[in-house]
Amino acid sequence: AEVYLVGNIAGNGWDATNAISMTKVSNGVYEFVSTLASNTEFKIIGQKSFGSLDWGNISGDGNSGFIGPKGDNGNIKFVGDGSSYKITVNLKAGVYTIKKQ
């Protein structure tokens, strides 16, 4: 399965057809490294469109570390400082992390 990032991250914008592919590191675990600005907002999608596979911050916009499925999520919001960060998502555990590199 492929997993993508969409939003104002790595210059791709909210056009899902331009979504950025995450790297699979193990079963259900994906990561991507990028510089993140102070107003970063993104979602995780399972196809290059806004379809049924859509994950974001659980229940609404924020940065809780927990993902929610389509219909029960908002944008993941992160305040970066222009440094490089690793975004890791574990779809099986329903969690994500954003760590400075």
How does the language model describe each region?
Residues A1-Q101:
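Insoluble glucan recognition modules
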